[in-house]
């Protein structure tokens, strides 16, 4: 059995990760750690775990003393809060999957620019592998530190990479318009996330400044083998979970829609969690799953190709992709513990 611990277990991504690992046939959950709910029972915070998990959450400060008891540590903390514990875990040969942003960007300078935090573990930036499972599987297999991708970058990168790998688009023309459920903003109390503030309304946020922008650009630059700068505009919509990413770009040459579909189906032919569909993606059809649904349209009037993708931001955009990466790291069947049919309604 894989002995696992989670720090940041009482956030939304941490809660979903706890649910997945608690049901994983190859995992024993050794501890759950929480800064805000230390020494409280996990099921007092999340009543869905009543009679399921009786553990008390340990405090974040106790995690270091428990590293000897685990093989892998999942960190689901705010930006800038992982440096000390991840450094210690790596030193003690504990594998780490970080669900936050601290190891996604390879440049400490870019991290400072977008997060306004001085990176304290620059060496680990070089060692960390970006955990976009379908794209970087071989590197993930041998890594001890995985930077789990963000939710918007997961949906957008999976949508766009086949176009880049096949040199189909003008890379200077990429625009990403994305919508997210409110859980993407996290569990911390915020006026903007109160029911009356976000219900019955939709709003853009982080326009021209969202922190996921350089992460998406870094991934697409790596895959295109050329520098990519793009426009990314996220929106908050009044639903609990889900992301719909709509990606626009100009075609380099005329191509038929069925040809593009063939390219996508070939690119993702061995990927059980990528569904190339004819109908337009909807977040309700991926809810509670590790699936990413992708559809394509071409607007011949404007020479634009539009790729749409839908994921569950707490699953493929966070917790279930982290479990997928753990499965890869340990040589398990990739679908183990996350082979879940989307829930509806």
From Swiss-Prot:
One Pfam family recorded for the sequence: Semialdhyde_dh
Catalytic activity field: N-acetyl-L-glutamate 5-semialdehyde + phosphate + NADP(+) = N-acetyl-L-glutamyl 5-phosphate + NADPH + H(+)
Family annotation (SUPFAM superfamilies): Glyceraldehyde-3-phosphate dehydrogenase-like, C-terminal domain (SSF55347), NAD(P)-binding Rossmann-fold domains (SSF51735)
Gene Ontology biological-process entries: L-arginine biosynthetic process
Compartment(s) where it occurs, according to its Swiss-Prot or TrEMBL record: Cytoplasm
Domain of life: Bacteria
Keyword terms of this UniProt record: Amino-acid biosynthesis, Arginine biosynthesis, Cytoplasm, NADP, Oxidoreductase
Pathway linked to the protein: Amino-acid biosynthesis; L-arginine biosynthesis; N(2)-acetyl-L-ornithine from L-glutamate: step 3/4
InterPro entries hit by this protein: AGPR_AS, AGPR_type-1, NAD(P)-bd_dom_sf, NAGSA_dehydrogenase, Semialdehyde_DH_NAD-bd
GO cellular component, one term: cytoplasm
PROSITE patterns attached to this UniProt entry: ARGC
Coarse class of the protein's main subcellular location: cytoplasm
Free-text function comment from the UniProt entry: Catalyzes the NADPH-dependent reduction of N-acetyl-5-glutamyl phosphate to yield N-acetyl-L-glutamate 5-semialdehyde.
Family: Belongs to the NAGSA dehydrogenase family. Type 1 subfamily.
Stored HAMAP family: ArgC_type1 (MF_00150)
Protein name: N-acetyl-gamma-glutamyl-phosphate reductase
Protein's gene: argC
């Amino acid at each position: 059995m894989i002995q696992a611990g989670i720090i940041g277990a009482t956030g939304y991504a941490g809660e979903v990760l706890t649910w997945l690992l608690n049901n994983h046939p190859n995992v024993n959950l050794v501890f759950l750690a929480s800064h805000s709910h230390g020494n409280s029972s996990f099921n007092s915070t999340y009543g869905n775990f009543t009679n399921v998990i009786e553990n008390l959450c340990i405090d974040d400060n106790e995690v270091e003393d428990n590293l000897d008891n685990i093989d892998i540590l999942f960190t689901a903390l705010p930006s800038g809060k992982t440096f000390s514990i991840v450094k210690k875990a790596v030193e003690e040969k504990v594998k780490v999957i970080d669900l936050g942003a601290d190891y996604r960007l390879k440049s400490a300078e870019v991290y400072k620019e977008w997060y306004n935090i001085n990176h304290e573990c620059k060496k680990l930036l070089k060692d960390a592998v970006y955990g976009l499972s379908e794209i970087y599987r071989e590197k993930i297999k041998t890594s001890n530190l995985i930077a789990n991708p963000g939710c918007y970058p997961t949906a957008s990168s999976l949508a766009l990479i086949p176009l880049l790998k096949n040199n189909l688009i003008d890379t200077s023309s990429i625009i990403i318009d994305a919508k997210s459920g409110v859980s993407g903003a996290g569990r911390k109390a915020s006026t903007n996330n109160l029911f009356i503030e976000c219900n019955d309304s939709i709003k853009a946020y982080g326009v021209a400044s969202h922190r996921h922008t350089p992460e998406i650009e870094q991934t697409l630059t790596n895959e295109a083998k050329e520098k990519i700068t793009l426009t990314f505009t996220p929106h908050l919509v009044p639903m609990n979970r889900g992301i719909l990413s709509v990606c626009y770009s100009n075609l380099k040459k005329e191509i038929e829609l069925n040809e593009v579909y063939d390219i996508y189906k070939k690119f993702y032919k061995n990927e059980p969690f990528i569904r190339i569909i004819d109908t337009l993606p909807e977040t309700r059809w991926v809810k509670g799953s590790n699936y990413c649904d992708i559809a394509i349209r071409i607007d011949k009037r404007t020479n634009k190709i539009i790729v749409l993708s839908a994921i569950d931001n707490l699953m493929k955009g966070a917790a279930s992709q982290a479990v997928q990466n753990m499965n890869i790291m340990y040589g398990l069947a990739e679908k183990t513990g996350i082979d879940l049919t989307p829930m509806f309604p």
